[in-house]
Amino acid sequence: MIGRERMTVASQRLIAERTYELTLSGRLVQEMRQPGQFVHVKVAASADPLLRRPLSLCHIDHKQGQCTIIYRQEGKGTALLAQKQPGDTVDVLGPLGNGFPLEAAPAGSRALLVGGGIGVPPLYELAKQLTKRGVKVVSVLGFQTKAAVFYEEEFAAFGETHVATDDGSHGTAGRVTDVIEARSLEFDVLYACGPKPMLRALAERFPNRPVYLSLEERMGCGVGACFACVCHVPGSETAYKKVCSDGPVFRAGEVVL
């Protein structure tokens, strides 16, 4: 159920280059269930910046009533968010969207989780929930450079984890697809989140496998009303789906990347 609340900042810390881990407390956490969903955050009380920021849920803790989001400071909005201190409040709308289908990976199966950059965070809650369901999780995380790497140890707590960096400064030199090929990683289902070129490469490499992709798009409303985040459906010039409400997770081939 979608709700809105002024959630309280429990903690915030810099975990990698321009990358922050923000933990929020509030009643709205009890509505957060599905990995891959996101929240829409208003970073300031004023009208500037006007639009909310869509931020993926990284970790959901119902017992503590807290959720964690990880974001990269890129513009004015996220710069303001990075200034928030414990005790401050943030206007949050959510949870929004359709997340990763857990039922696609039954107990005893092998799930490959592939994340690129700021697309890594939503895979953490997914890894946690899949592991609880008896699924073997293997993670491949891609970053530009060593300074951008985060949550390597956290993912390793759930299973085999590999890191790739574009410049070779940490882990395997190259891209996530290079790791999958070099390690001959097998899977029953693949879940991924990251930049479109990465998602496209995965969809093309595994055309006949169950592959679920979480898209990252700029959004206006977050609830499907403004049509700012539409993507086309294959084989049609007029049909489309909304990333915010139909997604952000789609099965490979469901939308044009």
Swiss-Prot record:
Binds 1 [2Fe-2S] cluster per subunit. InterPro entries: Cbr1-like_FAD-bd_dom, Cyt_c3_hydrogenase_gsu, Dihydroorotate_DH_ele_sf, Dihydroorotate_DH_Fe-S-bd, Dihydroorotate_DHASE_ETsu, FAD-bd_FR_type, FNR_nucleotide-bd, OxRdtase_FAD/NAD-bd. Its cofactor is [2Fe-2S] cluster; FAD. GO terms for biological process: 'de novo' UMP biosynthetic process. GO terms for molecular function: 2 iron, 2 sulfur cluster binding; electron transfer activity; flavin adenine dinucleotide binding; metal ion binding; oxidoreductase activity. Pfam families: DHODB_Fe-S_bind (PF10418), FAD_binding_6 (PF00970), NAD_binding_1 (PF00175). SUPFAM superfamilies: Ferredoxin reductase-like, C-terminal NADP-linked domain, Riboflavin synthase domain-like. FAD binds at residues 53-56, 70-72, 77-78. Residues 2-102 form the FAD-binding FR-type domain. Pathway: Pyrimidine metabolism; UMP biosynthesis via de novo pathway; orotate from (S)-dihydroorotate (NAD(+) route): step 1/1. Keywords: 2Fe-2S, Electron transport, FAD, Flavoprotein, Iron, Iron-sulfur, Metal-binding, Pyrimidine biosynthesis, Transport. [2Fe-2S] cluster binds at residues 221, 226, 229, 244. The keyword Cytoplasm does not apply. Heterotetramer of 2 PyrK and 2 PyrD type B subunits. Responsible for channeling the electrons from the oxidation of dihydroorotate from the FMN redox center in the PyrD type B subunit to the ultimate electron acceptor NAD(+). Belongs to the PyrK family. PANTHER family: DIHYDROOROTATE DEHYDROGENASE B (NAD(+)), ELECTRON TRANSFER SUBUNIT, DIHYDROOROTATE DEHYDROGENASE B (NAD(+)), ELECTRON TRANSFER SUBUNIT-RELATED. This is Dihydroorotate dehydrogenase B (NAD(+)), electron transfer subunit. It comes from Bacillus caldolyticus. The lineage of its organism: Bacteria, Bacillati, Bacillota, Bacilli, Bacillales.
